[in-house]
Amino acid sequence: WIAAEPEFSENQLARALIAAKAQGIEAIIVLNKLDLGANFDRAWTRLLPYQAMGYTVLAISASPKADLSPEQQIISNQSRLQLEAALKGKSTLVLGPSGTGKSTIINQWVPTAGAHTQEISKALNSGKHTTTSTTLYWIDA
């Protein structure tokens, strides 16, 4: 799980993909923050080689407050449906750096989760490490 902002580390992404591959785990790359224009476009371009290698790369906006164009809304909705279908009936690990929207999407999938969220630090271009524990959620998808 990565986002257009804060900028993701390709090294961290590659390590996660290698670990998943070594364990026979299907990896899906989710790029969040579709509403961030040029930042999103740059991040999407950086993910093109992963798409060429056969990884599923989905574009979404996890924030219900995001200002999306009608086209972006369609893309986000289609990606969410594709992601939910891929996760249905499976144990899933949502992995990614701080500030990428993992807790935001979990709160939407599990309304009772109450996972705390914050804005990212503009000064540091990173998340504020809001989620400090690992939690197992049951999702009826």
Residue ranges and their predicted role:
Residues 1-13, 25-28, 34-40:
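Conserved Switch II/interswitch segment of TRAFAC-class P-loop GTPases
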Residues 23-27, 53-56, 89, 141:
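Short glycine-/polar-rich loops that comprise or flank the Walker A/P-loop
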Residues 36-100:
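Canonical P-loop GTPase G-domain recognition
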Residues 15-18, 45:
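Alpha-helical scaffolding segments of alpha/beta enzyme cores, especially the outer helices
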